[in-house]
Amino acid sequence: MLNSLGGGASLQITIKAGGNGGLFPSQSSQNGGSPSQSAFGGQRSNIAEQLSDIMTTMMFMGSMMGGGMSGGLGGLGSSLGGLGGGLLGGGLGGGLGSSLGSGLGSALGGGLGGALGAGMNAMNPSAMMGSLLFSALEDLLGGGMSQQQGGLFGNKQPSSPEISAYTQGVNDALSAILGNGLSQTKGQTSPLQLGNNGLQGLSGAGAFNQLGSTLGMSVGQKAGLQELNNISTHNDSPTRYFVDKEDRGMAKEIGQFMDQYPEVFGKAEYQKDNWQTAKQEDKSWAKALSKPDDDGMTKGSMDKFMKAVGMIKSAIRGDTGNTNLSARGNGGASLGIDAAMIGDRIVNMGLKKLSS
């Protein structure tokens, strides 16, 4: 429990430990569900609550201590040092560290600064969350955060009811994503419309609730895209390509999607060093990607996998311009709908990772 801090406002934030195991399905919960459904519902609730608490800490704690995000939001060394700089780095990082122990404080204080250079795969979850929230704010403000004079909210610091409304907005958005899927949730919320003053023009609990909902939706979407961007592959010869071990669980999910559309993706192929031509795998894409033999797969097959990754990214973004998503499989199945469904699962995987 952390109490804040100056500006005539009082805020209580409880940061809960991780420990959410397993992957939850992307489907609506139903009344009277089985105990396992209830457990999944509780897990989703815990993840949404934990992430909304963290996003509240990142958004408001620096400004309530007098620095605002402006001290940090000014260039990616200082820009993610923005959620880093005055907000999460240096002194506040130490303050959070002593308040919250070895968990969030050290992760926020040191993680954002040091981990950025090592790339997103090397980041701890709080550092990744900081990066995603910064990106969501950049999108919302049109890249103008470094021009925000006096902090994101100006001289008027948000009140405790406004901050609580923001937290609830984030929680509601993330709960909807985790429960119903991003693809089903995106069309149900109206994005926040800002005037020329940006966030400095926000006033009242309703506006801050919508801010939380907008940023929660954006962070959820970006969490899924980041999971796909982080997929790593390697090859040990011109004909042997592999998905890296830590990404094979997700590759299996994508392979199952590819197996639904053999007319689009065909079958994986492999080629031994002394062969002149490749041969078709007798196993599914899901198995070829997640449990490869020593020969791996050909570059052409890996390119097909990356094509599928790109389709799922487009589905997560809601990119209707990707004509591949309009394809129909044998029997009339919609590639776009199935890509959105696997995208929903990957978004949930990303959010779960952020809460760990």
UniProtKB/Swiss-Prot annotation:
Subcellular location field: Secreted
Domain of life: Bacteria
Keywords, sorted A to Z: Hypersensitive response elicitation, Secreted
Record's compositionally biased regions (Low complexity): 25-38
Gene Ontology terms describing biological process: symbiont-mediated perturbation of host programmed cell death
Example of a GO cellular component annotation carried by this entry: extracellular region
Secreted found in the keyword field: yes
Stretch list, region Disordered: 22-42, 280-300
Function as written in the Swiss-Prot or TrEMBL entry: Elicits the hypersensitive response (HR) in the plant upon infection. Harpin elicits HR in non-hosts and is also required for pathogenicity in host plants.
Family: Belongs to the harpin HrpN family.
Name of the protein: Harpin HrpN
